[in-house]
Design a protein with these regions (language model features):
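Signature of lipid phosphatidyltransferase scaffolds
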Residues: 108-178
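Short, surface-exposed acidic/glycine-rich loop or hinge patches that mediate macromolecular interfaces
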Residues: 7, 29-30, 134
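Short Pro/Gly-enriched beta-strand edge/turn motifs at strand-loop
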Residues: 79-90
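Short solvent-exposed loop/turn micro-motifs enriched in small/polar/acidic residues
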Residues: 92-96, 122
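Residues that form or flank phosphate/diphosphate-binding pockets in enzymes
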Residues: 33-34, 96, 139
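Primarily the HKD phosphodiesterase
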Residues: 15-81
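Short beta-strand scaffold segments in enzyme catalytic cores
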Residues: 100-103, 129-130
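Glycine-rich phosphate-binding "P-loop"
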Residues: 1-8
Length: 178
């Protein structure tokens, strides 16, 4: 087991992500667009990516969620197998997925305080544990699965969708009732 504390712990997480051969499982409340794009690039290279995240915690994370959904839909519409399973949890179900868990190839697990954003990786003082012991990794994998299976996929707003239009109409109506 290794521990890292302070500014810059992102280098340890990024190194592990880049070394992935089979899969990466992620639980994080927020994911920046840059880090999201790196993960999506890994999926394009055949690395199976599973992400459990929250809906609308930050604007940037919301954009990352929309990009993920768009990639999945585009690949599905083109009958491509795209190894990205991206579960966005509605705040109505769980206000926030706050667990930060990163499992790489079932051989490394990282837990700690760092979200998947540049600020958390490079600017904030964060704490992570990097575990390689099979017993610890197995426990963390089982815990991740419990959390994953206890959550449902949320519908997310995509620009230009029917729901987006209905929300705009509701806002206009509310303005007239005041």
């Amino acid at each position: 087991m290794e521990s890292h504390i302070g500014v810059g712990v992102g280098k340890f997480i990024e190194t592990e992500f880049e070394s992935a051969k089979n899969h990466i499982w992620i639980s994080s409340p927020t994911i920046s667009q840059n880090i999201g794009k790196k993960l999506f690039d890994l999926a394009k290279k055949g690395i199976n990516i599973r992400v459990l995240t929250s809906d609308k915690i930050t604007n940037e994370s919301d954009l990352t969620n929309q990009l993920a959904k768009k990639l999945i839909l585009n690949n599905k519409n083109n009958n491509n197998l795209f190894p990205l399973d991206y579960k966005i949890v509605s705040p109505k179900e769980i206000p926030m997925i706050h667990a930060k868990i990163y499992i790489i190839d079932g051989k490394c697990a990282i837990i700690g305080s760092a979200n998947l954003t540049e600020n958390h990786f490079w600017n904030y003082a964060e704490y992570i544990l990097v575990l390689r012991e099979p017993d610890f990794i197995q426990t963390i994998k089982e815990d991740f699965e419990k959390l994953w299976n206890s959550c449902h996929y949320a519908e997310i707003d995509m620009p230009g969708t029917k729901k987006n239009f209905k929300d705009k109409v509701r806002k206009i109506r509310r303005g007239f009732t005041k």
